[in-house]
A protein has these predicted regions:
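Acidic/His-rich active-site region of diverse nucleotide-sugar glycosyltransferases
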Residues: 69, 76, 91, 98-137
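Short, acidic, metal-binding catalytic loop of nucleotide-sugar glycosyltransferases
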Residues: 23-31
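Cell-envelope/extracellular polymer assembly enzymes that use nucleotide-activated donors
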Residues: 3-5, 33
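A conserved acidic beta->alpha catalytic loop
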Residues: 23, 38-47, 63
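Short aromatic/hydrophobic "clamp" motif used to bind/position activated sugar donors
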Residues: 83
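Glycine-rich, basic loop-to-helix element that forms the pyrophosphate-binding segment
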Residues: 60-78, 88
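Short beta-strand/loop segment that forms part of the nucleotide-sugar
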Residues: 31-40, 59-61
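Active-site beta-to-alpha loop of glycosyltransferases that engages the nucleotide-sugar donor
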Residues: 8-19, 40
């Protein structure tokens, strides 16, 4: 299996972490590390990670660098064949990652893969990019 790391950018998302991170941790295959890059949170995000999710790696950024800036700084500190970037308000089911890694391994010309995002409030509907709260199908 290739080295893959799930990196979740967080800013003041303690409640999102409590609600959604358990599914990400539970669905991560053996050998895939889950990491949270904290974008200078001022809430209890770091405390929640330390006490409730001790197996999750934490990258502490000293300020809120925004979405792109936060991920750019975080990914400079992570080594992997594949980086799986998730928002902090995403729930993942068992088996969501295998098809993604399979495509990346089989198709060397593919650089980016995204699963379908299903609405958190109505799982019969597709969620658009940029919306908040989802479920990976």
């Amino acid at each position: 299996m290739p080295v893959a790391k799930i990196v979740i950018l967080n800013w003041n998302g303690a409640e999102h972490l409590r609600r959604f991170l358990p599914s990400v941790v539970a669905a991560a295959p053996a050998g895939v590390e889950v990491m949270v890059a904290d974008n200078g949170s001022t809430d209890d995000s770091l405390g929640v990670l330390a006490t409730e999710f001790p197996s999750v790696g934490v990258l502490r950024l000293e300020a809120n660098y925004g979405f792109a800036g936060g991920y750019n700084r975080a990914l400079k500190q992570v080594e992997a064949d594949y980086y799986l970037l998730l928002n902090s308000d995403i729930e993942t089911p068992e088996g969501w990652l295998a098809p993604i890694l399979d495509v990346l391994e089989r198709e060397p010309d593919v650089a980016v893969v995204s699963p379908k995002l299903i609405s958190w409030t109505d799982r019969t509907k597709f969620e658009y990019a940029g919306a908040s709260g989802g479920f990976i199908d």
